[in-house]
Amino acid sequence: MTAALTLASASPVSGANDGQIIGKNQITLTGDRLTPEALWAMGRIGTFAVSPDAQKIVYTVSYYSVQQNKSHTVLYLMDANGANPTLLTTTADNESEPAFTPDGQRITFLSGKSGSSQIWEMALDGTSRRQVSFCHKDVEGYKFSPDGKKVIIVHSVDTYTSIEKKYDDLPLSSGMVITDLNYKHWDRYVTTIPHIFVADVQDGRTGDGIDLLNGEPFECPMLPFGGSEQFNWSPDSRHIVYTCRKKTGRDYAISTDSDIYRYDTATGQTENLCKPADYKEPEIDPSRSMEHQAINHLDRDCNVGYDTNPAYSPDGKYVAWLSMARNGY
């Protein structure tokens, strides 16, 4: 039996940019077949954050329009028990990456309202919106320190480790000179990579910060799916722990050995929390299975697998993260 699908879209609302909001669809299904149209009519929950007092949850929902071939990401706030979901987004601008300020009195989020992706904040009822970051590049992710005096910001930086830079006199050329592996993630060519920056917050505003991976051709968060879960602050707001696979080209393509690093904002020093200071990686033969490589048969635990998503314990004494035992796909 074929299902009958009826969609009644939410009434369009003009936003600040005079665009039309793609809102929640009212879905009526009869029958036993779930169709592609029904799937696209459903909202999809994305990122979320819990308030410091654990009483509220802010989260994103993306709604889709097959006719317009685009989506709209909005913010909702609800009680921690699931009651009273309230739509906070009232314009056609996409709003994402929500978080609570350290005091729990306001909500921060990313918006392109100013012409580029920047950090904004608003009251818990969605009013009193104002721009917080004024960076020269798009902000792709962020995380404020517990004391609210600093913020980690994610920006994309150019990279030429696997794809050569285009000639200046051929800016419209679509051709590429590929020199190594790791030149592509799924459908995306790797011409830029994410780096994390740390910036001061003064009078409720912030701007460009210091690149923690300055001059290094490595990613944080790691492509293609990494996000703000891959970096975190210590409770005293001094240290930053982050995930990084410090490899390029063929070595990156065949290895899953990422590590957890700790950056000291007071000294500017970085240390690897996964490897002993005297660690030297055994040579890997790309023609052989990783199962039988020397790196997976060391006489001590050097965290040679996929280490990611670090977080401090509430008292700041420990760092926990997710880890795989061995190197290799």
Predicted regions and their residues:
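Residue-level detector of Asp-centered blade-edge/turn motifs that repeat once per structural unit
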Residues: 52-53, 102-103, 146-147, 235-236, ...
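Hydrophobic beta-strand positions that form the internal "hydrophobic ladder"
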Residues: 54-57, 104-108, 151, 240, ...
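Bacterial N-terminal signal peptides
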Residues: 1-8
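Blade/loop signatures of beta-propeller domains
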Residues: 15-33, 69, 194-195, 199-201, ...
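A flexible loop/linker signature enriched in serine peptidases of the S9 family
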Residues: 61-74, 89-95, 110-120, 134-140, ...
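Beta-strand-rich domains and repeat architectures in extracellular enzymes and scaffolds
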Residues: 37-73
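Short loop/turn segments that connect beta-strands within beta-propeller blades
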Residues: 79-83, 123-127, 201-205, 264-268
